[in-house]
């Protein structure tokens, strides 16, 4: 099969011993196979062999490496904060881990490294970053996951413009390593302009149906 990476290899068999039998795969290991998501997840080890999935893993690895390099070049220090910490309720519920040594007491998985990175700032680490695992015990939605990875960053003794400038340049360098050129500076929009124009503080500015204030048009009417 010349479509496979090893398709041109031929083997001349003189003896075969069957050590075990295998079931027919649940789906073909190809990108364009129409397979239900629950089947793909049940046979994840097969799904990861598909070229697209393997490429996604490689892309994530390469981009994470590029981010780390970009932060390192700007004298940021990567610090792994603990995954077992005290419960510090934020916007969601904590995942609790019972303590074997202290019955009835619990650790909590961090919703974010917020308190821990603040300790680093007090301790003299003025530029910190981490590719951090976060855990939030909340209902599953498109933009809500119980476990996710975020790039966590903190800087001391800086202004708002310092933070935005450093992150812009870091992202531009990382994307540049991936062959994507970013035009700097990135577009900036004031909070109230975003709310007045789009009705949300994180708008997709490609959306053409902007909010229009028609108060003057209907002033004095019963509408």
Model-inferred region functions:
Residues 1-223:
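Class II aminoacyl-tRNA synthetase catalytic cores and aaRS-like
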């Amino acid at each position: 099969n010349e479509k496979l990476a090893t398709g041109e290899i031929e083997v001349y068999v003189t003896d075969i011993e069957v050590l075990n039998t295998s079931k027919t795969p649940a789906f073909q290991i190809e990108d364009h196979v129409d397979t239900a998501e629950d089947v793909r997840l049940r046979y994840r080890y097969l799904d990861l062999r598909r070229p697209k999935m393997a490429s996604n893993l490689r892309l994530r690895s390469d981009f994470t490496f590029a981010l780390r390099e970009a932060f390192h070049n700007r004298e940021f220090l990567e610090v792994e904060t603990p995954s077992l910490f005290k419960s510090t309720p934020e916007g969601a519920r904590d995942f609790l881990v019972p303590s074997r040594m202290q019955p009835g007491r619990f650790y909590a998985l961090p919703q974010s490294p917020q308190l821990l990175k603040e300790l680093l700032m007090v301790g003299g680490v003025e530029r910190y970053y981490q590719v951090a695992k976060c855990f939030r015990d909340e209902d599953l939605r498109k933009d809500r996951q119980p476990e996710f990875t975020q790039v966590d960053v903190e800087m001391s003794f800086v202004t708002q413009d310092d933070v935005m400038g450093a992150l812009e340049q870091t992202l531009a360098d990382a994307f540049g390593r991936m062959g994507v050129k970013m035009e700097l500076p990135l577009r900036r929009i004031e909070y109230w302009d975003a709310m007045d124009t789009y009705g949300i503080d994180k708008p997709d500015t490609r959306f053409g149906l902007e909010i229009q204030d028609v108060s003057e048009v209907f002033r004095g009417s019963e509408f």
